Design a protein with these regions (language model features):
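N-terminal secretory signal peptides that target proteins for export/translocation
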Residues: 1-4
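Bacterial N-terminal signal peptides
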Residues: 8-18
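Polybasic, low-complexity, intrinsically disordered segments
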Residues: 19-23, 242
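Helix-capping and short linker residues that terminate individual alpha-solenoid repeat units
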Residues: 45, 49, 76, 92-96, ...
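Conserved H-X4-D acyltransferase segment
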Residues: 68, 158
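Asp-box/WD-like beta-propeller blade repeats and closely related beta-sheet repeat scaffolds
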Residues: 123-156
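Extended ligand-binding clefts on enzyme/binding-domain cores
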Residues: 148-152, 159-265, 272-283, 295-326, ...
Length: 358
């Protein structure tokens, strides 16, 4: 596959002007990757984003802790698990207030992974109760998971509930919902997802289809996190694998030359700036695909390495990850000062897979 990357001189200048710590030494060494992960983790915990603590944005912090848990597993550093436990305890191991809203389910990913580490009933009870009620009264995916971000928020919770209970009803529900949402929002001609119905059959001011980078990052990250718990013999596993492969090819073609993706995947001119939350999720998904022999190493390793370099260049000396598009629903402007917890979570997910690359 021939990869076509968008070139932008301002982005190259940004990369060249990145902190010296991001450009010295081997940024791909395990020591360096661990150091960047720890620095970003520590800075983000010390500088919580105020709005992320609100219930209606519980997902933003939940996405951070998905990365924290992954970092704990990949590094063996229990400080990640300890911090995740403190957060879960502050939530009383409870999901958000909206029982059918995927955003309010995202925290369950961390709760369930902590339950595996210590099987205390309180760690499982609320997540299982909320999801059981939803499974008992199913609706189409396009109704409950009507925006593509939802495919990161809720499906990995269902996959993890299956893993801890062995009850296939969670996989059956996940599968039906996922593919109905996909039939609704996926554009097979582009191998990408629209954010929601408002972008179907709609062109931007430049006459291009609008595929939001972070939205597709959510989908690729969610696909990986479902595959992690989906049995090898599951009847539709090959379909998830094919989806990951197709999306990987689509996003690789539009990677910026500095390694970071633009907010609008098919039209970098719509928002001609780098965006790091999408870069983190794409790098994570591509690296996981290579590590699990789903994606071709020769094709994707250069893409992954550029993605990681772009992320590292976006971390300042203190550990703040910049260039994270704010909470929104479409491509938008981003600055070097913009930070959100889900961006740091995406970097931790990517770093966790970078540590496994050979």
């Amino acid at each position: 596959m021939k990869l076509q990357r968008f070139s932008s001189l301002p982005l190259l200048v940004v990369l060249l002007c990145a902190p010296a710590s991001a450009q010295t030494g081997d940024i791909y060494s395990k020591k360096s990757v661990r150091a960047v992960m720890q620095k970003v983790f520590e800075w983000q915990v010390a500088h919580p984003v105020e709005i992320d603590a609100l219930n209606n944005n519980l997902w933003a912090r939940a996405a951070f802790y998905a990365g924290v848990m992954s970092a704990g597993r990949s590094t063996g550093d229990r400080r990640y698990f300890e911090q995740a436990t403190r957060w879960a305890e502050s939530r009383n191991w409870k999901l958000g207030d909206r029982p059918r809203h995927a955003d309010d389910h995202a925290a369950g990913q961390t709760f369930l992974e902590l339950y595996v580490l210590r099987k205390e009933p309180a760690r499982l009870a609320n997540t299982k109760s909320v999801i059981d009620a939803m499974v008992a009264a199913p609706r189409p995916g396009r109704e409950d998971w009507w925006w593509c971000d939802a495919l990161f928020m809720a499906p990995p919770v269902l996959a993890r509930l299956y893993a801890v209970t062995g009850d296939r009803k969670y996989l059956d529900f996940l599968d039906a919902m996922w593919w109905d949402t996909t039939d609704f929002l996926y554009d097979p001609s582009e191998g990408l997802y629209y954010r929601d119905k408002n972008f179907l059959n709609k062109l931007n001011a430049n006459g291009r289809k609008v595929f939001w980078a972070r939205g597709n990052g959510w989908v690729m990250g969610g696909t990986v996190r479902v595959l992690q718990r989906l049995p090898k013999n599951h009847p539709t596993r090959a379909r998830y694998v094919k989806l990951l492969q197709t999306m990987a090819a689509s996003v690789a073609r539009v990677q910026g030359e500095d390694g970071r993706w633009h907010p609008s995947l098919l039209d970098p001119a719509e928002a001609p700036v780098p965006e790091t939350s999408s870069t983190g999720f794409f790098t994570y998904a591509l690296a996981w695909g290579v590590n699990n022999r789903i994606l071709e190493r020769k094709t994707y390793l250069p893409v992954i390495r550029r993605g990681w370099a772009g992320l590292v260049a976006s971390v300042n000396e203190e550990g703040k990850l910049g260039w994270v598009q704010r909470i929104g629903l479409a491509p938008d402007k981003v600055t070097a000062d913009d930070n959100q917890e889900y961006g740091s979570g995406a970097l931790l997910l990517a770093g966790s897979e970078m540590l496994k690359l050979k």
